[in-house]
């Protein structure tokens, strides 16, 4: 699913808007016809982001998609402290996700 044009288009738009360090595809769902129905992305962003809620809101408002998607945010320092801790969601993302950007 890493090569899905809809997912890649959203990842590209996110990269243009906020220049994250990394975008990782966490998961996706398809219907009985193997058509994409939703997906979830992790964004690893700079520690300098002033307001994570504002960034999240602006991305959801500015990026239009016919397919529902969710975003999970980590600052670089949060990501670095959690990605190697087995059992954390960051560890799971690192080990099972697909890097789309960065």
Report residues per predicted region:
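A short acidic/basic microdomain associated with nuclease active sites
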Residues: 27
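Catalytic core of pol beta-like nucleotidyltransferases
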Residues: 1-22, 30-36, 46-102
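Short glycine-rich, basic-tinged beta-strand/loop micro-motifs
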Residues: 39
């Amino acid at each position: 699913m890493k090569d899905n044009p809809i997912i890649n288009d959203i990842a590209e738009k996110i990269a243009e808007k906020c220049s994250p360090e990394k975008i990782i595809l966490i998961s996706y769902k398809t219907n009985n016809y193997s058509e994409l129905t939703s997906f979830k992305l992790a964004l690893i962003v700079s520690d300098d982001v002033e307001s994570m809620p504002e960034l999240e809101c602006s991305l959801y408002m500015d990026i239009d998609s016919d397919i529902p998607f969710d975003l999970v945010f980590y600052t670089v320092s949060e990501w670095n402290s959690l990605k190697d801790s087995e059992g954390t969601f960051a560890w799971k993302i690192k080990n099972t996700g697909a890097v789309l950007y960065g």
